[in-house]
C-alpha cells in the first residue's frame, strides 16, 4: 500500500504566496499589476495566484516542491491597493527574488512576469503597470549601445532637439525615388530622415538598392550643407541572420545608425543587435510598431512605461515615445513619465505620472525619445517645451506634405525649431507664446509661412483612452 509522503491536493494560493508583512529586498524585482478578477474571486487569493503563476507555482501541490527552497524562490504578493475611480479592479504588488531570472535577459523576465498568467481563468483582465528593476539586475544588462552624449558627438550638434522626418509614402516608392526624397529633406535642413517601420525589402524596393540610394543622398546633402546628415536604415528582417547581413552592409556603406522594429522583430533579436551596434560603433534607432496592441487597453496588457524600461535594458539609442499633441495615444503626464524613464539616471516614484516605483539605472546611458506621429509646424512650440533638447522631433507628413515640396518643408521645420529654441533661451514661455514666436519667424521664411497656412486647422483633439488612474479621482 502506497504511503502519503507529502500534503497532496489543491490549496489556496494565499496560503503560500500572500505575504502582507513582507518587506521587499533591494535586490527584488518588483511588479505592480492591475487585476480585474472574475466575479466572486477574493482579492488576496487572486493576487497570490498572480504571484504564484508568474513565479514557482502551479494549480496543485507538487512533491518536487520538497526538492528546492520554495520559500526562497517564490514570488510574493505583498500589497493591495484600490484603483482610484474604478472598483472593478485593484493594484497588486508582487516581489520576485532576483535569482528567478537569467542575468541580462529581459526575454526571460517577461516570460515570467507577462507570460501564461495573463491567460489565467480567474482573471477577467490583467495589466502590468510598472516594474522595478534593482540596480543589481540593471548592471547585468548591456543597455543602450552608446547613449545621448555619444550621439551628440557623432552628429556634432548641441543645444537643441534633433530634427527628423519619416519618408512618405511609407510604401510604394522605388529605391531611386526614395533616395531622392531623402536628399530633398536633408538638404532642406533636417538632421535625420528615416525608413518607416514597415519598409523592409519588398518587391517595389529591395533593401540593397534602398540602402545605396539613401547613402548617396546623405553624402550629397552633407557635401552641399557642410552639416552631418543621417538616415536610419531599417534592418528589420525575417530572420536574425538576414538582419545582421543588412546591418553589416549598412556599416560598409558608412552609415552611422540603423533601425529595428523591436516588438515585431523580437526582444532577443533586439538585444543581439544592440550588442552588435555597441561593438561596431553604430547607433540604434528603435521603432515601437505593435506597442498599442499591448499597451493601449487600460485594463489588460503591458503599460508602455514597462516596455520603455525593458527596452532601455535590452538596448537602444532612440525610442519612439508619442508626442502628446500629435495623432497617437499618450497624455502629457504619462508621456513625461516615460520620457524620464528613457533619459534619467534615477526616477522617483510619482503616481501623478503613473510611476509606481523608484528606478535606478546607475551609469547606464540615457536614450533619446523620438516625438513622431501627426505633428506639424504649429506643434513645434509645445514639442520643444515638452521634450527639451535631448530628443528627436520627427515630422513625416509635416515635412513632405509641404505644398512646395520636401526641401521647403524641411526648411520650414528647421526655421521654426531654431526660433522656438531661441525664444525659450531668452526666457519666453514658448508653448504659451508659440503663435507669436512662429509668426515672427515666418516674416523671414516664406517656407514657414505657407506651412503655417496649410496646417492651421489641423488638430488631433481626441480623448486619451488610457488615462492615468489618478485622473479618475
Swiss-Prot record:
Family of this protein: Belongs to the RuBisCO large chain family. Type I subfamily.
Extra information: The basic functional RuBisCO is composed of a large chain homodimer in a 'head-to-tail' conformation. In form I RuBisCO this homodimer is arranged in a barrel-like tetramer with the small subunits forming a tetrameric 'cap' on each end of the 'barrel'.
Positions of the catalytic residues: 168, 287
N6-carboxylysine: residues bearing it: 194
Binding site for substrate: 116, 166, 170, 288, 320, 372
Cofactor entry: Mg(2+)
PROSITE patterns: RUBISCO_LARGE (PS00157)
Name this protein carries in UniProt: Ribulose bisphosphate carboxylase large chain
Species the sequence originates in: Hydrogenophaga pseudoflava (Pseudomonas carboxydoflava)
GO molecular function annotations of the record: magnesium ion binding; monooxygenase activity; ribulose-bisphosphate carboxylase activity
InterPro entries found in the cross-reference section: RuBisCO (IPR033966), RuBisCo_large_chain_AS (IPR020878), RuBisCO_lsu_C (IPR000685), RuBisCO_lsu_C_sf (IPR036376), RuBisCO_lsu_fd_N (IPR017443), RuBisCO_lsu_N_sf (IPR036422), RuBisCO_lsuI (IPR020888)
Subunit architecture: Heterohexadecamer of 8 large chains and 8 small chains.
BP terms from Gene Ontology: reductive pentose-phosphate cycle
Keywords: Calvin cycle, Carbon dioxide fixation, Lyase, Magnesium, Metal-binding, Monooxygenase, Oxidoreductase
Annotated EC: 4.1.1.39
Site feature: Transition state stabilizer: 327
Xref: Gene3D superfamilies: Ribulose bisphosphate carboxylase, large subunit, C-terminal domain, RuBisCO large subunit, N-terminal domain
Binding residues annotated for Mg(2+), in chain numbering: 194, 196-197
CC cofactor note: Binds 1 Mg(2+) ion per subunit.
Chemical reaction(s) catalysed: 2 (2R)-3-phosphoglycerate + 2 H(+) = D-ribulose 1,5-bisphosphate + CO2 + H2O; D-ribulose 1,5-bisphosphate + O2 = 2-phosphoglycolate + (2R)-3-phosphoglycerate + 2 H(+)
Role this protein plays: RuBisCO catalyzes two reactions: the carboxylation of D-ribulose 1,5-bisphosphate, the primary event in carbon dioxide fixation, as well as the oxidative fragmentation of the pentose substrate. Both reactions occur simultaneously and in competition at the same active site.
